Protein backbone atom coordinates (compact mmCIF):
# COMPACT_ATOMS: atom_id res chain seq x y z
CA UNK A 1 0.00 0.00 0.00
CA UNK A 2 0.92 3.61 -0.19
CA UNK A 3 1.24 4.95 3.29
CA UNK A 4 2.24 8.50 2.57
CA UNK A 5 2.99 10.14 -0.71
CA UNK A 6 4.57 13.43 -1.53
CA UNK A 7 4.58 14.60 -5.10
CA UNK A 8 7.86 15.74 -6.51
CA UNK A 9 9.17 16.68 -9.88
CA UNK A 10 9.93 13.36 -11.47
CA UNK A 11 8.48 10.01 -11.93
CA UNK A 12 10.46 6.85 -12.14
CA UNK A 13 10.86 3.64 -14.00
CA UNK A 14 13.37 1.18 -15.37
CA UNK A 15 15.57 1.97 -18.33
CA UNK A 16 14.84 4.66 -20.80
CA UNK A 17 11.61 6.25 -21.77
CA UNK A 18 9.79 8.24 -24.27
CA UNK A 19 8.29 11.36 -25.48
CA UNK A 20 6.05 14.29 -25.09
CA UNK A 21 2.31 14.42 -25.49
CA UNK A 22 0.56 14.59 -22.14
CA UNK A 23 2.77 15.60 -19.40
CA UNK A 24 1.72 15.21 -15.94
CA UNK A 25 5.06 15.49 -14.38
CA UNK A 26 4.98 12.73 -11.92
CA UNK A 27 7.38 12.42 -9.23
CA UNK A 28 7.19 9.51 -7.00
CA UNK A 29 3.80 8.18 -6.39
CA UNK A 30 5.04 5.18 -4.53
CA UNK A 31 3.17 1.95 -4.77
CA UNK A 32 3.50 -0.26 -1.73
CA UNK A 33 2.88 -3.84 -2.81
CA UNK A 34 3.60 -5.31 0.58
CA UNK A 35 0.83 -5.83 3.08
CA UNK A 36 2.54 -3.79 5.74
CA UNK A 37 2.07 -0.05 5.67
CA UNK A 38 5.38 1.77 5.38
CA UNK A 39 6.13 5.43 5.27
CA UNK A 40 6.78 6.41 1.69
CA UNK A 41 9.79 8.42 0.80
CA UNK A 42 9.08 12.04 0.01
CA UNK A 43 8.12 12.80 -3.54
CA UNK A 44 8.57 16.09 -5.20
CA UNK A 45 5.82 17.61 -7.19
CA UNK A 46 4.48 14.66 -9.09
CA UNK A 47 1.90 16.90 -10.61
CA UNK A 48 3.48 20.32 -10.37
CA UNK A 49 4.75 22.23 -13.38
CA UNK A 50 2.98 19.96 -15.79
CA UNK A 51 0.41 20.07 -18.50
CA UNK A 52 -2.92 18.69 -17.37
CA UNK A 53 -3.91 15.27 -18.55
CA UNK A 54 -6.82 15.11 -20.95
CA UNK A 55 -10.00 14.30 -19.10
CA UNK A 56 -10.12 10.72 -17.95
CA UNK A 57 -13.17 8.64 -17.23
CA UNK A 58 -14.18 8.40 -13.62
CA UNK A 59 -15.52 4.91 -14.18
CA UNK A 60 -13.63 1.70 -13.66
CA UNK A 61 -12.25 1.80 -17.17
CA UNK A 62 -11.06 4.35 -19.67
CA UNK A 63 -11.55 4.12 -23.40
CA UNK A 64 -8.75 3.11 -25.72
CA UNK A 65 -10.74 2.69 -28.88
CA UNK A 66 -14.45 3.21 -29.20
CA UNK A 67 -15.68 0.94 -31.95
CA UNK A 68 -17.80 -2.20 -32.13
CA UNK A 69 -18.05 -4.86 -29.45
CA UNK A 70 -16.09 -7.81 -30.85
CA UNK A 71 -15.89 -11.23 -29.32
CA UNK A 72 -12.52 -11.86 -27.68
CA UNK A 73 -10.56 -13.56 -30.45
CA UNK A 74 -7.00 -12.43 -29.88
CA UNK A 75 -4.63 -13.54 -32.59
CA UNK A 76 -1.56 -12.41 -34.44
CA UNK A 77 -3.75 -11.10 -37.25
CA UNK A 78 -5.56 -8.26 -35.50
CA UNK A 79 -4.95 -5.44 -33.07
CA UNK A 80 -6.27 -6.78 -29.73
CA UNK A 81 -6.81 -3.24 -28.41
CA UNK A 82 -9.21 -2.20 -31.17
CA UNK A 83 -12.80 -2.08 -30.00
CA UNK A 84 -11.98 -2.30 -26.31
CA UNK A 85 -11.51 -0.01 -23.38
CA UNK A 86 -8.81 -0.91 -20.87
CA UNK A 87 -9.43 -1.73 -17.24
CA UNK A 88 -8.36 0.84 -14.69
CA UNK A 89 -6.00 -0.80 -12.18
CA UNK A 90 -8.05 -0.75 -8.93
CA UNK A 91 -4.99 -1.17 -6.75
CA UNK A 92 -3.17 1.78 -8.25
CA UNK A 93 -6.31 3.90 -8.22
CA UNK A 94 -6.98 3.14 -4.56
CA UNK A 95 -3.44 4.02 -3.53
CA UNK A 96 -3.52 7.33 -5.38
CA UNK A 97 -6.85 8.18 -3.78
CA UNK A 98 -6.04 7.03 -0.26
CA UNK A 99 -2.42 8.11 0.05
CA UNK A 100 -1.41 10.50 -2.69
CA UNK A 101 -4.39 12.81 -2.88
CA UNK A 102 -4.69 13.45 0.88
CA UNK A 103 -1.11 14.73 0.86
CA UNK A 104 -1.88 17.37 -1.77
CA UNK A 105 -3.07 20.83 -0.83
CA UNK A 106 -3.53 22.52 -4.20
CA UNK A 107 -6.87 21.74 -5.83
CA UNK A 108 -5.23 21.69 -9.26
CA UNK A 109 -2.88 18.92 -8.14
CA UNK A 110 -5.76 16.96 -6.64
CA UNK A 111 -7.57 17.14 -9.97
CA UNK A 112 -4.49 15.98 -11.85
CA UNK A 113 -3.87 13.13 -9.43
CA UNK A 114 -7.50 12.05 -9.75
CA UNK A 115 -7.17 12.08 -13.53
CA UNK A 116 -4.00 9.98 -13.39
CA UNK A 117 -5.69 7.46 -11.10
CA UNK A 118 -8.33 6.87 -13.77
CA UNK A 119 -5.85 6.15 -16.56
CA UNK A 120 -5.66 2.39 -17.20
CA UNK A 121 -2.37 0.77 -16.22
CA UNK A 122 -1.17 -2.81 -16.22
CA UNK A 123 -1.36 -4.87 -13.04
CA UNK A 124 1.95 -6.65 -12.39
CA UNK A 125 1.78 -10.32 -11.45
CA UNK A 126 5.23 -10.11 -9.87
CA UNK A 127 4.55 -12.75 -7.21
CA UNK A 128 2.35 -15.81 -7.30
CA UNK A 129 0.10 -14.42 -4.58
CA UNK A 130 -1.02 -11.66 -6.97
CA UNK A 131 -2.72 -14.15 -9.30
CA UNK A 132 -5.94 -14.43 -7.25
CA UNK A 133 -6.24 -10.64 -7.50
CA UNK A 134 -6.06 -11.02 -11.26
CA UNK A 135 -9.09 -13.29 -10.94
CA UNK A 136 -10.94 -10.64 -8.93
CA UNK A 137 -10.24 -8.06 -11.61
CA UNK A 138 -11.32 -10.37 -14.42
CA UNK A 139 -14.52 -11.11 -12.51
CA UNK A 140 -15.19 -7.38 -12.19
CA UNK A 141 -14.55 -6.90 -15.91
CA UNK A 142 -16.91 -9.76 -16.75
CA UNK A 143 -19.61 -8.20 -14.57
CA UNK A 144 -19.22 -4.78 -16.16
CA UNK A 145 -19.23 -6.23 -19.65
CA UNK A 146 -22.38 -8.24 -18.88
CA UNK A 147 -23.98 -5.02 -17.66
CA UNK A 148 -23.38 -3.45 -21.06
CA UNK A 149 -19.96 -1.80 -20.93
CA UNK A 150 -19.51 -0.28 -24.37
CA UNK A 151 -16.95 -0.70 -25.68
CA UNK A 152 -16.29 -3.87 -23.70
CA UNK A 153 -13.44 -3.85 -21.21
CA UNK A 154 -10.17 -5.77 -21.62
CA UNK A 155 -7.91 -6.82 -18.76
CA UNK A 156 -4.21 -5.87 -18.88
CA UNK A 157 -1.50 -7.67 -16.90
CA UNK A 158 2.27 -8.17 -16.75
CA UNK A 159 3.60 -11.71 -16.28
CA UNK A 160 6.77 -11.19 -14.25
CA UNK A 161 8.02 -13.95 -11.97
CA UNK A 162 10.85 -15.85 -13.67
CA UNK A 163 13.25 -17.76 -11.44
CA UNK A 164 16.46 -15.74 -10.92
CA UNK A 165 14.57 -12.75 -12.27
CA UNK A 166 16.40 -9.52 -13.13
CA UNK A 167 19.62 -11.42 -13.72
CA UNK A 168 21.72 -8.39 -14.71
CA UNK A 169 20.69 -6.20 -11.78
CA UNK A 170 19.64 -6.52 -8.17
CA UNK A 171 16.72 -4.17 -7.65
CA UNK A 172 13.90 -6.46 -8.86
CA UNK A 173 15.07 -9.91 -7.85
CA UNK A 174 12.06 -12.20 -7.53
CA UNK A 175 10.73 -14.93 -5.28
CA UNK A 176 11.98 -18.00 -7.18
CA UNK A 177 15.51 -19.38 -7.43
CA UNK A 178 16.56 -21.81 -10.13
CA UNK A 179 18.58 -23.69 -7.53
CA UNK A 180 15.45 -24.22 -5.42
CA UNK A 181 13.02 -25.68 -7.92
CA UNK A 182 12.30 -22.31 -9.47
CA UNK A 183 11.45 -23.63 -12.93
CA UNK A 184 8.74 -25.94 -11.64
CA UNK A 185 7.42 -23.25 -9.31
CA UNK A 186 7.24 -20.87 -12.25
CA UNK A 187 5.29 -23.39 -14.29
CA UNK A 188 2.80 -23.69 -11.43
CA UNK A 189 2.53 -19.90 -11.42
CA UNK A 190 1.76 -19.92 -15.16
CA UNK A 191 -0.76 -22.71 -14.64
CA UNK A 192 -2.55 -20.54 -12.08
CA UNK A 193 -2.70 -17.64 -14.54
CA UNK A 194 -4.06 -19.94 -17.22
CA UNK A 195 -6.74 -21.12 -14.81
CA UNK A 196 -7.89 -17.55 -14.23
CA UNK A 197 -7.91 -16.73 -17.93
CA UNK A 198 -9.88 -19.87 -18.77
CA UNK A 199 -12.37 -19.19 -15.99
CA UNK A 200 -13.10 -15.82 -17.60
CA UNK A 201 -12.86 -16.98 -21.19
CA UNK A 202 -15.24 -14.26 -22.36
CA UNK A 203 -12.90 -11.48 -21.18
CA UNK A 204 -10.24 -10.15 -23.53
CA UNK A 205 -6.94 -10.42 -21.66
CA UNK A 206 -3.73 -8.73 -22.82
CA UNK A 207 -0.44 -9.89 -21.32
CA UNK A 208 3.10 -8.56 -21.41
CA UNK A 209 5.53 -11.42 -20.92
CA UNK A 210 8.56 -11.10 -18.62
CA UNK A 211 10.12 -7.63 -18.85
CA UNK A 212 13.90 -7.58 -19.38
CA UNK A 213 14.32 -11.36 -19.55
CA UNK A 214 15.00 -12.06 -23.23
CA UNK A 215 16.78 -8.73 -23.67
CA UNK A 216 19.21 -9.83 -20.98
CA UNK A 217 19.91 -12.97 -22.99
CA UNK A 218 20.89 -10.80 -25.95
CA UNK A 219 23.34 -8.48 -24.21
CA UNK A 220 24.19 -9.77 -20.73
CA UNK A 221 25.37 -13.34 -21.04
CA UNK A 222 28.73 -12.15 -19.75
CA UNK A 223 26.96 -11.73 -16.40
CA UNK A 224 27.25 -15.06 -14.61
CA UNK A 225 23.71 -15.00 -13.25
CA UNK A 226 22.30 -14.41 -16.75
CA UNK A 227 24.44 -17.12 -18.31
CA UNK A 228 23.34 -19.54 -15.62
CA UNK A 229 19.70 -18.55 -16.08
CA UNK A 230 19.64 -18.75 -19.88
CA UNK A 231 18.20 -22.23 -20.25
CA UNK A 232 15.67 -21.68 -17.46
CA UNK A 233 14.52 -18.38 -18.96
CA UNK A 234 14.00 -20.02 -22.34
CA UNK A 235 12.22 -23.05 -20.90
CA UNK A 236 9.95 -20.91 -18.74
CA UNK A 237 9.15 -18.43 -21.50
CA UNK A 238 8.33 -21.28 -23.86
CA UNK A 239 6.01 -22.76 -21.24
CA UNK A 240 4.27 -19.43 -20.70
CA UNK A 241 3.70 -18.87 -24.42
CA UNK A 242 2.34 -22.37 -24.95
CA UNK A 243 0.09 -22.44 -21.89
CA UNK A 244 -1.31 -18.95 -22.33
CA UNK A 245 -2.02 -19.38 -26.03
CA UNK A 246 -5.76 -19.09 -25.50
CA UNK A 247 -8.54 -17.63 -27.69
CA UNK A 248 -9.17 -14.66 -25.39
CA UNK A 249 -5.49 -13.80 -24.89
CA UNK A 250 -3.08 -11.49 -26.70
CA UNK A 251 0.58 -11.60 -25.69
CA UNK A 252 3.49 -9.24 -26.22
CA UNK A 253 7.00 -10.37 -25.35
CA UNK A 254 9.02 -7.66 -23.68
CA UNK A 255 11.76 -6.38 -26.01
CA UNK A 256 13.72 -3.82 -24.02
CA UNK A 257 13.96 -0.41 -25.65
CA UNK A 258 15.90 1.64 -28.18
CA UNK A 259 18.81 2.23 -25.84
CA UNK A 260 19.16 -1.46 -25.13
CA UNK A 261 18.51 -3.54 -28.24
CA UNK A 262 18.36 -0.70 -30.76
CA UNK A 263 22.12 -0.58 -31.31
CA UNK A 264 23.40 -1.99 -34.64
CA UNK A 265 25.34 -4.72 -32.85
CA UNK A 266 22.30 -5.84 -30.85
CA UNK A 267 19.27 -5.58 -33.10
CA UNK A 268 20.12 -8.49 -35.42
CA UNK A 269 20.94 -10.97 -32.64
CA UNK A 270 17.82 -9.79 -30.80
CA UNK A 271 15.65 -10.55 -33.81
CA UNK A 272 17.13 -14.02 -34.09
CA UNK A 273 16.48 -14.75 -30.42
CA UNK A 274 12.90 -13.48 -30.40
CA UNK A 275 12.08 -15.33 -33.60
CA UNK A 276 13.52 -18.56 -32.21
CA UNK A 277 11.52 -18.21 -28.99
CA UNK A 278 8.36 -17.62 -31.00
CA UNK A 279 8.96 -20.57 -33.32
CA UNK A 280 10.06 -22.92 -30.53
CA UNK A 281 6.69 -22.31 -28.88
CA UNK A 282 5.03 -23.43 -32.15
CA UNK A 283 4.31 -19.87 -33.30
CA UNK A 284 1.38 -19.33 -30.92
CA UNK A 285 -1.52 -17.40 -32.46
CA UNK A 286 -2.00 -15.34 -29.31
CA UNK A 287 1.47 -13.78 -29.61
CA UNK A 288 0.82 -10.49 -31.33
CA UNK A 289 4.30 -9.06 -31.02
CA UNK A 290 6.59 -7.17 -28.68
CA UNK A 291 6.33 -4.57 -25.93
CA UNK A 292 8.94 -1.81 -25.79
CA UNK A 293 10.02 0.83 -23.32
CA UNK A 294 8.42 -1.02 -20.41
CA UNK A 295 9.23 0.90 -17.21
CA UNK A 296 11.51 3.17 -19.19
CA UNK A 297 11.74 6.74 -20.35
CA UNK A 298 12.51 6.95 -24.08
CA UNK A 299 10.55 9.28 -26.32
CA UNK A 300 8.15 7.72 -28.80
CA UNK A 301 9.39 10.16 -31.43
CA UNK A 302 11.85 12.97 -30.91
CA UNK A 303 13.36 15.46 -33.35
CA UNK A 304 16.79 15.73 -31.76
CA UNK A 305 18.43 12.80 -30.02
CA UNK A 306 19.39 13.67 -26.43
CA UNK A 307 23.12 13.82 -25.73
CA UNK A 308 22.93 10.79 -23.44
CA UNK A 309 21.88 8.55 -26.34
CA UNK A 310 25.54 8.43 -27.33
CA UNK A 311 25.19 8.96 -31.05
CA UNK A 312 22.77 6.14 -31.78
CA UNK A 313 20.40 7.28 -34.55
CA UNK A 314 17.82 4.85 -33.18
CA UNK A 315 17.16 7.03 -30.16
CA UNK A 316 13.38 6.80 -29.80
CA UNK A 317 10.87 3.96 -29.76
CA UNK A 318 9.33 4.73 -33.14
CA UNK A 319 12.74 4.45 -34.78
CA UNK A 320 13.43 1.31 -32.78
CA UNK A 321 10.33 -0.63 -33.80
CA UNK A 322 10.71 0.41 -37.43
CA UNK A 323 14.31 -0.83 -37.41
CA UNK A 324 13.44 -3.98 -35.48
CA UNK A 325 10.37 -5.13 -37.44
CA UNK A 326 12.21 -5.92 -40.72
CA UNK A 327 14.89 -7.84 -38.82
CA UNK A 328 12.22 -9.87 -37.05
CA UNK A 329 10.39 -10.54 -40.29
CA UNK A 330 13.58 -11.75 -41.95
CA UNK A 331 14.09 -14.11 -39.02
CA UNK A 332 10.58 -15.51 -39.42
CA UNK A 333 8.61 -13.51 -36.86
CA UNK A 334 6.27 -10.77 -38.05
CA UNK A 335 5.45 -8.53 -35.11
CA UNK A 336 3.42 -5.56 -34.02
CA UNK A 337 4.32 -3.50 -30.99
CA UNK A 338 3.02 -1.70 -27.96
CA UNK A 339 5.04 1.02 -26.24
CA UNK A 340 4.95 2.07 -22.60
CA UNK A 341 4.35 5.82 -22.46
CA UNK A 342 3.61 5.87 -18.75
CA UNK A 343 6.70 7.86 -17.81
CA UNK A 344 8.09 9.38 -20.97
CA UNK A 345 6.28 12.69 -20.96
CA UNK A 346 9.28 14.96 -20.39
CA UNK A 347 12.11 14.98 -22.89
CA UNK A 348 14.99 14.97 -22.51
CA UNK A 349 15.00 13.30 -19.13
CA UNK A 350 17.49 13.91 -16.34
CA UNK A 351 19.56 10.86 -17.30
CA UNK A 352 23.31 11.32 -17.26
CA UNK A 353 23.74 8.16 -19.34
CA UNK A 354 21.27 6.16 -21.39
CA UNK A 355 21.87 3.10 -19.27
CA UNK A 356 20.78 4.89 -16.10
CA UNK A 357 17.43 3.29 -15.40
CA UNK A 358 16.72 3.72 -11.71
CA UNK A 359 14.32 6.39 -10.41
CA UNK A 360 15.45 8.88 -13.03
CA UNK A 361 14.99 12.57 -12.31
CA UNK A 362 13.09 14.97 -14.58
CA UNK A 363 10.58 12.56 -16.06
CA UNK A 364 6.80 12.75 -16.44
CA UNK A 365 3.64 10.92 -17.45
CA UNK A 366 3.37 10.47 -21.21
CA UNK A 367 0.53 9.93 -23.66
CA UNK A 368 -2.52 8.19 -22.28
CA UNK A 369 -3.38 4.74 -23.66
CA UNK A 370 -4.60 4.90 -27.24
CA UNK A 371 -4.57 2.97 -30.50
CA UNK A 372 -4.05 6.24 -32.37
CA UNK A 373 -0.29 5.83 -32.66
CA UNK A 374 0.27 7.08 -36.20
CA UNK A 375 2.33 4.00 -37.04
CA UNK A 376 0.91 0.79 -38.46
CA UNK A 377 3.46 -1.26 -36.52
CA UNK A 378 2.34 0.20 -33.19
CA UNK A 379 -0.89 -1.29 -31.89
CA UNK A 380 -1.13 1.01 -28.89
CA UNK A 381 0.51 3.31 -26.41
CA UNK A 382 -0.05 1.92 -22.92
CA UNK A 383 0.86 2.64 -19.32
CA UNK A 384 2.69 -0.46 -18.14
CA UNK A 385 4.66 0.88 -15.19
CA UNK A 386 2.29 2.82 -12.92
CA UNK A 387 3.54 6.35 -12.39
CA UNK A 388 5.48 6.77 -9.20
CA UNK A 389 6.49 3.21 -8.43
CA UNK A 390 10.09 2.88 -7.38
CA UNK A 391 12.61 1.13 -9.60
CA UNK A 392 14.77 0.16 -6.66
CA UNK A 393 15.92 1.12 -3.22
CA UNK A 394 18.68 3.63 -2.51
CA UNK A 395 19.38 1.91 0.81
CA UNK A 396 22.90 0.51 0.42
CA UNK A 397 22.30 -2.00 3.22
CA UNK A 398 19.47 -3.71 1.34
CA UNK A 399 20.08 -7.05 -0.37
CA UNK A 400 18.29 -5.61 -3.41
CA UNK A 401 20.35 -2.43 -3.60
CA UNK A 402 21.66 -1.75 -7.10
CA UNK A 403 24.33 0.89 -7.61
CA UNK A 404 22.25 2.57 -10.34
CA UNK A 405 19.78 3.62 -7.64
CA UNK A 406 22.53 5.61 -5.95
CA UNK A 407 23.59 7.57 -9.02
CA UNK A 408 23.32 11.36 -9.03
CA UNK A 409 20.51 11.28 -11.60
CA UNK A 410 18.38 8.97 -9.43
CA UNK A 411 15.81 10.27 -6.97
CA UNK A 412 16.83 9.56 -3.40
CA UNK A 413 15.93 8.32 -0.88
CA UNK A 414 13.90 5.60 -2.59
CA UNK A 415 12.15 2.44 -1.35
CA UNK A 416 12.27 -1.10 -2.74
CA UNK A 417 11.31 -1.70 -6.36
CA UNK A 418 7.60 -1.92 -6.95
CA UNK A 419 6.70 0.15 -3.90
Where are these regions (language model features)?
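Stable alpha-helical elements in mature extracytoplasmic
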Residues: 134-137, 189, 193, 233-236, ...
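Surface-exposed substrate-engagement region within the catalytic domains
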Residues: 101-111, 247, 261-406
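Structural recognition of the beta-strand scaffold that forms the well-ordered cores
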Residues: 85-87, 123-125, 154-159, 204-210, ...
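Fungal secretory targeting signals
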Residues: 1-6, 10, 21-58
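N-terminal carbohydrate-binding/catalytic regions of secreted carbohydrate-active enzymes
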Residues: 80-199, 386-402, 406-409
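Surface-exposed cleft-lining segments at the edges of enzyme active sites
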Residues: 120, 125-126, 180, 217-229, ...
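Substrate-binding cleft of extracellular glycoside hydrolase catalytic domains
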Residues: 142-254, 269-276, 284-286
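Fungal extracellular Ser/Thr-rich, low-complexity intrinsically disordered regions
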Residues: 52-77
Amino acid sequence: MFSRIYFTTPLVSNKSQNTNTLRLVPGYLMNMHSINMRAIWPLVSLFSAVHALPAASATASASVAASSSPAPTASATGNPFEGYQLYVNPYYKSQVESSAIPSLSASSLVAQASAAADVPSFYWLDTADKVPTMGEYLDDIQTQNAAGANPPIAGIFVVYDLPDRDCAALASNGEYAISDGGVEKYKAYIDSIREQVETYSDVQTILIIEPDSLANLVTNLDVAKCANAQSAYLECTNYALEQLNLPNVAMYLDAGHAGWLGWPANIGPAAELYASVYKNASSPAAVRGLATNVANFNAWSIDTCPSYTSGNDVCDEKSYINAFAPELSSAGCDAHFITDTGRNGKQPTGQSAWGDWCNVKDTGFGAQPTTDTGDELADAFVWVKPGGESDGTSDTSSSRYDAHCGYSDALQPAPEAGT
